[in-house]
Amino acid sequence: MLLKVQHVRKEFQNRTHALTDASFSVSQGDFVSVIGPSGAGKTTLFRILNGSLRCDGGAILVNGVHFESADRRTRRAIQTTIGTIYQDFALVENATCRQNVLNACLPDMAFLPAVCGFFGKERVAEADALLDRVGLADKVHEPVKNLSGGQKQRVAIARALMRHPALLLADEPVASLDPVTGRQILELLRDIQQDQKLTVLMNSHNLELSQEFSSRLIGLNQGTVVLDAPADTPAKEILAAVYHRQEDQP
């Protein structure tokens, strides 16, 4: 099992319980979506999984290794196997597409203005190949600030792949995009996932897209996993279990 989340809890200083009992597992090669209403704990969960936030209890195992209780070196080693793409892209706007992709190779994503000169030709060629894979071969030297939202997310995907991740966290990857562009991004993500047998865990508010592109759904509500089911589970059952409402009738 690539990822195991076992009874994970997180409470903030204002005593808000963001996660009260989150437990699920993800197998190698799965495309799993985490769904739920706003405030369900999805973003907190993803921040814990990418290492930017510590949980208050429970355990997270990546390839059998306890992530939370590991020493600093082991945590860093685990984090290098996890790539993340974000709703807001998290790119360096004034840098080129190539520079942003190469940025993934730097410690803690620290940016070097002369980053392309910092790496050898092989790394630069790999970055360019990834930009080609996501459909941006003609944008290698283009500053990110000149790109559309969909193109920026393609750069972000290439950057995440530069880490050769075993697990890709997609945190609301199409929430800021129009429906057509969002679907194109998810189609690209699914193609890459299937080609590379990559494991994808996606946080999404869009049930329809989650069902279409995922193999499994994890439903969160009030910090607790209330659903773990195949993606083709009838929508009315998902709505009742996760959102506590019935499917709207025409």
Predicted features along the sequence, with ranges:
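Conserved ABC ATPase signature
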Residues: 143-147, 151
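Catalytic Walker B motif of ABC-type/P-loop ATPase nucleotide-binding domains
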Residues: 168-171
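Helix-to-loop junction immediately C-terminal to a conserved catalytic motif
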Residues: 50
